[in-house]
Amino acid sequence: MQFPHPGPAAAPAVGVPLYAPTPLLQPAHPTPFYIDDILGRGPAAPTPTPTLPSPNSSFTSLVSSYRTPVYEPTPVHPAFSHHPAAALAAAYGPSGFGGPLYPFPRTVNDYTHALLRHDPLGKPLLWSPFLQRPLHKRKGGQVRFSNDQTVELEKKFETQKYLSPPERKRLAKMLQLSERQVKTWFQNRRAKWRRLKQENPQSNKKDALDSLDTSCEQGQDLPSEQNKGASLDRSQCSPSPASQEDPDSEISEDSDQEVDIEGDKGYFNAG
């Protein structure tokens, strides 16, 4: 009995299991010869090639998790200060993610917390530069008048150097000021007016004439200081014997005229 000679097609069937390459795979069971097994680590997942992070990538969430202990103002609790993670965060936290790879390491909450931090006195840290003084107040508590109020006060002062209480009340109501503010403004303005008179004595006579005419029209008496500076006869306005004998007796206690000459002298000497 003769067997047929095997053809060339039968040879590959025998050679496939003999010459097929077998891939080198890590054994499934742990062995004591691999470094990962010695260190007790499992098979690590393949790490992708590092690329530049984008705002939409998962790198943002990774940065926020490592950035929290770095920029948080609360220090690390002493019980966890010896932990290696705390030392790692302190060593690599500020510079690891604050470089050019991620130019915006802080979120809005970080800057908001910085603005709301408080100093030991209990005031906000960045609050003092934004404090503004009231516009109508100066340093020292002096009142700053508006331009319209100053113009009206100057007009009134040109025609009348002294105000009676009813006139002062009416002027204060018109300018929306208090009577004390109007009185103080006139005192300071008279002190400035006297200082200018001393610097320019030639205008004393003209000012005295103008004040005398105004006083005669309004039925008011001039203060004693203006009488001493002007060479005029008091009998032109009111020829009373009391005023000719004693110029200081013209201002009675019952008069409505405001008497603040001493206060003006004190302000002038202080200035």
Curated annotation (Swiss-Prot):
It is found in: Nucleus; Nucleus, Nuclear body; Cytoplasm. Residues 1-138 are annotated as: Interaction with SOX13. Interacts with CD81; the interaction prevents nuclear translocation of HHEX. Interacts (via N-terminus) with SOX13; abolishes the SOX13-mediated inhibition of WNT-mediated transcriptional activity via competitive inhibition of the SOX13-TCF7 complex. Interacts with EIF4E; the interaction inhibits EIF4E-mediated mRNA nuclear export. The keyword Transcription regulation applies. GO terms for molecular function: chromatin binding; DNA-binding transcription activator activity, RNA polymerase II-specific; DNA-binding transcription factor activity; DNA-binding transcription repressor activity, RNA polymerase II-specific; HMG box domain binding; RNA polymerase II transcription regulatory region sequence-specific DNA binding; sequence-specific DNA binding. Residues 195-271 are annotated as: Disordered. Residues 138-271 are annotated as: Required for WNT signaling induction. This is Hematopoietically-expressed homeobox protein Hhex. The keyword Transferase does not apply. Recognizes the DNA sequence 5'-ATTAA-3'. Transcriptional repressor. Activator of WNT-mediated transcription in conjunction with CTNNB1. Establishes anterior identity at two levels; acts early to enhance canonical WNT-signaling by repressing expression of TLE4, and acts later to inhibit NODAL-signaling by directly targeting NODAL. Inhibits EIF4E-mediated mRNA nuclear export. May play a role in hematopoietic differentiation. One of its GO terms (biological process) is negative regulation of vascular endothelial growth factor receptor signaling pathway. Residues 138-197 bind DNA.
